[in-house]
């Protein structure tokens, strides 16, 4: 059994956000309206959370967020929801839109204006957004990135797509807004210093490249292609990367895993592959950067047991992504969670399908651990096998102290669970798991155990939820960025607003915490400013 809703539209949508890709505009508008009616203050923040790239956010030269801010990096869904705000609550849109390039990219301002025309919403007053861009040009912190994403003005004959046609027209309008000619506008764009490495490459001055200044995604592409070998740069790059504890990367862990799969390295040790040393060190260093960034957002102080679904349905593709399976997402997230967890289960993953057994990672190398991970796509999805294994250990080895057992259980799965066949027709996996644990553990210990249900967004879609929004021991979440876990699991007890008593956070509390991160606190309803 699963619940059709947690009882809160916002908690439902927060949990399912990882499934939101390329949706119909009407569906997005309907859902944004629903959460606005439930809680407008959090609803205005939700699109910015969806867009946010996990990192410390630079507001200006003097102000940077204290911790890494965690989001979903979901551009399309974020822009469509913001269009709803622009259409229905324009004051709230214009008062907060300056946050968008801070949590995302300066390209986002151009993209949302393009969306406004593409979907015939026609709600945006472009001069107000031009003013945001103009302010960015005057900021020492942001000026070069603003210039980087300004569309170059071209002749109409060279604009052959809807994007180039519309952004070319917008660029011309922006040049008029700035009071400069088209030629001066293009010269202004070219004066930007962001990504100087591209200019060096275009000038064929390869010896002048400074590897540490190349952005993470670009570095990833250069190293995994033929660029280094074609220009005799392999030795130069290798001598640099092997000395780096981390390397820039703001993507998702599964993108690193996908690169390994493309090179023939898969989990389970089925295919032994020797990676070029520069590739291995780059992937390891970029993974370590993702772990470091996540830990800068908070520390996990609990014993977290990560459970990896390796059932047959995990071989299905992820909704909205080409050549990416649920297994790709799940194994990369499981590895990530095992590394950011510093408790008793650091480097431990519990796999489950028809059966269940633990896998202990014996290396700190991302590439080597990926090879160790079990291969997915076999058998059913028996999550209760994890609980049965914990109960079995407790019965057979009662001398193991409670402090060595998990206090949080994370299930990384497509949520296509087997019928439990235990606990009655109205029992969820969450309910059944608690009942089983109560047979061998003290109630006060079981009451402290939390379950995190991480949906890897299969094409089958999510059937429902394992618990309600007001339950304090369960949370449903989805997506590709696992860094939010350090925020959610770093939560201390909260004081109940009604009773004044201290209690554990519910799913509603955790969603509110995610939407109250430092940068999102700048987002306010117009009538509250």
Language-model segments: which ranges?
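Long lumenal/extracellular ectodomains of secretory and single-pass membrane proteins
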Residues: 1-329, 339-529
């Amino acid at each position: 059994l699963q619940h059709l809703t947690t009882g809160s539209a916002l908690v439902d949508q927060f949990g399912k956000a990882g499934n939101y890709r390329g949706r119909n505009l009407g569906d997005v508008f309907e859902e944004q309206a629903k959460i606005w009616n439930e809680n407008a203050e959090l609803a205005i923040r939700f699109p910015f959370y969806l867009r946010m790239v996990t990192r410390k956010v630079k507001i200006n030269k003097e102000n940077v967020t204290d911790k890494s801010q965690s989001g979903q990096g979901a551009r399309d869904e974020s822009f469509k929801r913001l269009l709803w705000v622009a259409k229905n609550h324009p004051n709230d849109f214009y008062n907060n839109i300056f946050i968008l390039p801070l949590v995302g990219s300066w390209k986002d301002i151009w993209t949302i204006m393009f969306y406004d025309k593409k979907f015939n919403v026609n709600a945006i007053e472009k001069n107000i957004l031009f003013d945001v861009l103009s302010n960015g040009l005057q900021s020492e912190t942001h000026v070069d990135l603003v210039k980087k994403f300004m569309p170059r003005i071209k002749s109409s004959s060279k604009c052959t797509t809807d994007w180039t046609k519309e952004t070319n027209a917008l660029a011309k309008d922006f040049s008029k807004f700035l009071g400069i000619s088209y030629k001066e506008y293009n010269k202004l764009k070219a004066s930007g210093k962001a990504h100087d490495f591209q200019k060096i490459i275009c000038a064929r001055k390869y010896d002048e490249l400074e590897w540490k200044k190349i952005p993470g995604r670009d570095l990833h592409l250069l190293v995994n292609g033929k660029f280094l070998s074609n220009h005799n740069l392999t030795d130069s790059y290798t001598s640099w990367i092997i000395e780096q504890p981390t390397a820039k990367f703001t993507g998702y862990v599964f993108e690193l895993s996908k690169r390994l799969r493309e090179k023939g390295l898969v989990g389970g040790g089925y295919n032994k592959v020797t990676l070029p040393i520069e590739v291995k060190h780059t992937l390891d260093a970029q993974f370590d950067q993702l772990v470091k960034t996540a830990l800068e957002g908070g520390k996990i102080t609990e014993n977290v047991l990560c459970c990896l679904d390796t059932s047959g349905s995990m071989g299905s593709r992820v909704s909205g992504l080409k050549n990416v399976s649920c297994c790709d997402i799940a194994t990369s997230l499981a590895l990530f969670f095992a590394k950011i967890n510093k408790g008793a289960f650091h480097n431990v993953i519990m796999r489950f399908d028809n059966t269940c057994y633990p896998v202990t990672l014996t290396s700190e190398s991302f590439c080597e651990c990926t090879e160790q991970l079990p291969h997915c796509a076999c058998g059913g999805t028996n999550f209760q096998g994890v609980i049965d294994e914990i109960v079995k250990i407790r019965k057979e080895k009662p001398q193991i102290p409670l402090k060595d057992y998990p206090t949080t259980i994370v299930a990384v799965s497509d949520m296509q669970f087997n019928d439990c066949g235990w606990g009655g027709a109205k029992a969820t996996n969450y309910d059944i798991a608690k009942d089983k644990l109560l047979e061998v553990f003290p109630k006060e210990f079981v009451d402290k155990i939390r379950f995190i249900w991480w949906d890897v967004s299969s094409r089958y879609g999510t059937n429902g939820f394992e618990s309600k929004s007001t339950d304090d021991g369960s949370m449903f979440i989805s997506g590709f960025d696992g860094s939010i876990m350090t925020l959610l699991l770093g939560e201390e007890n909260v004081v109940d607003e009604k009773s004044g008593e201290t209690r554990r956070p519910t799913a509603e509390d955790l969603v509110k915490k995610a939407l109250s991160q430092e940068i999102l606190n700048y987002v306010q309803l117009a009538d509250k400013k």
